[in-house]
């Protein structure tokens, strides 16, 4: 496949991810998780593309970190031609191996669509069990313990290799970050490659996943602002459905340095984005790069580059946690 990009600005966000990923219909979550027990919820969206009614079985095979089969529940589904149905399986698990940066234990859910004993489709979904919470008093809590995020913004390119997301280059980048003492990374400022997130899951690197560098106000002549009004929801949905099974992702971002956040015009856009994120995944907090008039819909209030005197004291009285980047002014 040959791709040619026109209108490349000096700081381009364009790149190439060589693998197509189309299996976005399985969502694995672990609500009520703890070291003693957890509930694994597997939601599978099934589409009947046949011309007649179908009765199928949705089967999920749960494999432990060592590959041992733990359970194999199933659910019968009947649906009409063209109908889309969500099958929900809830699986109880005792004494799960918790995922963390120091011990990134991964389970696998193999979801199969069966009819008359024949496998029609199969998707394998790696996932981790890790209770995630946040509070003003303690900040981000992973597996019940406060975690200080030590990391930085990492763009999608691979140095002299350019913006092609070669799997080994993505893995090496994550390994270098972890060996340098990072425990977290912010994806700046567009969707990372699946290979990058897979490596973060395996190595144990926490991720702030962030989709947009512009909304409606352009930063460059030919940037994404031309398409944002018509495409933001489709692109955001694609990122969330693709990435939400990664245990390494602990936070969603909705923008980077957007001019609109300083104006009242940005507030309804931020609310639209925040509401859409929560409709697809309510298990993680939201944030944005740059504080401003739009911070109402988010849980984590950022302080990007500087914190002016008095700001810390004022925000500490709210229900939002401050995330500081680069510099605190005094």
Model-derived features: positions:
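Secreted/periplasmic carbohydrate-active enzymes, especially glycoside hydrolases
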Residues: 1-194, 199, 203-207, 235, ...
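Substrate-binding/catalytic cleft of secreted carbohydrate-active enzymes
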Residues: 174-177, 184-330
């Amino acid at each position: 496949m040959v791709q040619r990009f026109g209108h490349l600005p000096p700081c381009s966000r364009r790149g190439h991810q060589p693998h197509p990923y189309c299996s976005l219909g399985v969502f694995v979550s672990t609500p009520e998780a703890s070291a003693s027990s957890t509930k694994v919820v597997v939601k599978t969206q099934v589409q009947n593309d046949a011309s007649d009614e179908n009765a199928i079985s949705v089967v999920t095979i749960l494999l432990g970190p060592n590959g041992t089969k733990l359970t194999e529940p199933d659910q019968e589904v009947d649906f009409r031609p063209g109908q889309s149905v969500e099958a929900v399986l809830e699986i109880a698990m005792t004494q799960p191996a918790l995922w963390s940066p120091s011990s990134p234990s991964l389970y696998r859910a193999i979801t199969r669509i069966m009819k008359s004993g024949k496998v029609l489709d199969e998707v394998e979904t790696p996932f981790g069990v890790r209770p995630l919470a946040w509070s003003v008093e303690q900040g981000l809590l992973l597996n019940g313990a406060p975690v200080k995020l030590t990391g930085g913004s990492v763009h999608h390119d691979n140095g002299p290799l350019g913006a092609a997301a070669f799997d080994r280059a993505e893995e090496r980048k994550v390994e270098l970050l972890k060996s340098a003492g990072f425990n977290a990374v912010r994806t700046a400022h567009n969707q990372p490659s699946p290979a990058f997130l897979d490596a973060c899951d395996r190595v144990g690197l926490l991720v702030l996943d962030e989709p947009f560098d512009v909304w409606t106000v352009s930063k460059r002549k030919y940037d994404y602002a031309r398409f944002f009004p018509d495409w933001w929801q489709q692109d955001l949905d694609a990122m969330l459905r693709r990435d939400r099974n990664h245990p390494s992702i602990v936070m969603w971002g909705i923008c980077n340095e957007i001019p609109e956040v300083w104006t009242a015009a940005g507030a309804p856009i931020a609310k639209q984005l925040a509401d859409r994120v929560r409709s697809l995944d309510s298990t993680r907090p939201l944030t944005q790069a740059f504080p401003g008039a739009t911070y109402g819909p988010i849980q984590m209030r950022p302080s990007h580059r500087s914190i002016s005197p008095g700001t810390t004291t004022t925000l500490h009285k709210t229900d939002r946690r401050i995330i500081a980047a680069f510099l605190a002014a005094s």
